[in-house]
Design a protein with these regions (language model features):
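Nucleic acid-processing catalytic cores of prokaryotic defense/repair systems
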Residues: 46-49
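NTP/phosphate- and nucleic-acid-binding module
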Residues: 1
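Extended, highly charged clamp/arch subdomains and adjacent linkers
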Residues: 4-12, 17-39, 52-249
Length: 249
């Protein structure tokens, strides 16, 4: 029996794109409203963690092949560059669908059962802001380690599968003047005044819960939660006392 015809590329599916299809099916479970709400949220989380692992292992391997100029095609007839292009297109669509599912389905459903997620710290009420600032001082600040980058300090090592906040900071004017006077560099004083942007990172600690529960609204009975990184972003200026924080995300 001649099996050669069955080796045609059209008879095979690319392994990596097949995996993306699997993750799409997982996300479809999160879109099924017959499934309990918190189970649907778990499926969104699983989709995200699967995608992280996929990029860390499989996509990294394909990029290594491209860098090594390895051009052999797989059984589906795709080389590494073609696979990466296909993966990029499909995963962009997957992530967009993931965010749509979370924002348009999961979040409204949570609000309907009395739990509101505050997505931006600017939306906090005065009482909530006071609570999260106190929580930051007591629980978050002691476990944070900000890292800056400049000509003397290379880009900091960021661990896999960690959440980090990036910030652009500038030396405060009074600090620049003080530094110039201490060095007695009168001729270069104007140059010292020039503010240069510096990049800094803050790793969101994994030892703390990602979602922080805020006090219940006594009038409506509604409960509120805010993301840990939003609290850090709100208070990030406390980590760089000699700097102005231009932006942080």
């Amino acid at each position: 029996m001649d099996i050669a015809p069955y080796k045609k590329p059209e008879y095979f599916r690319n392994r990596e794109l097949s995996w993306v299809s699997f993750d799409e099916r997982v996300l479809n479970e999160a879109r099924d409203k017959s499934i309990p709400l918190f189970e649907r949220l778990k499926f969104i989380s699983i989709t995200s963690s699967n995608l992280d692992e996929f990029y860390m292992v499989r996509v990294a391997s394909l990029k290594d092949q491209v860098h090594a100029n390895y051009t052999k095609k797989d059984l589906s007839g795709m080389d590494a560059k073609e696979q990466l292009a296909g993966i990029s297109k499909r995963t962009h669509e997957l992530v967009q669908l993931q965010y749509n599912t979370y924002n348009r389905s999961a979040v409204p459903s949570l609000e309907h059962v009395g739990l509101t997620i505050i997505s931006e710290h600017e939306k906090l009420t005065k009482e909530q802001a006071e609570y999260v600032d106190s929580y930051f001082e007591e629980n978050i600040y002691p476990v944070l380690t900000p890292m800056a980058m400049d000509s003397a300090r290379p880009f900091p090592l960021i661990r896999n599968k960690t959440l980090n906040i990036g910030a652009l900071v500038q030396k405060k004017e009074d600090s620049l003047l003080s530094r110039a006077e201490d060095k007695k560099e009168k001729k270069g004083k104007e140059k010292e005044k020039e503010k240069e942007l510096e990049f800094a990172t803050v790793q969101v600690p994994s030892v703390l819960p990602r979602f922080i529960l805020l006090p219940q609204d006594e009038k409506t009975g509604q409960r509120y939660v805010i993301l840990l990184e939003e609290i850090i972003e709100r208070n990030i200026g406390k980590l760089f006392l000699s700097y102005d924080v231009v932006c942080a995300h």
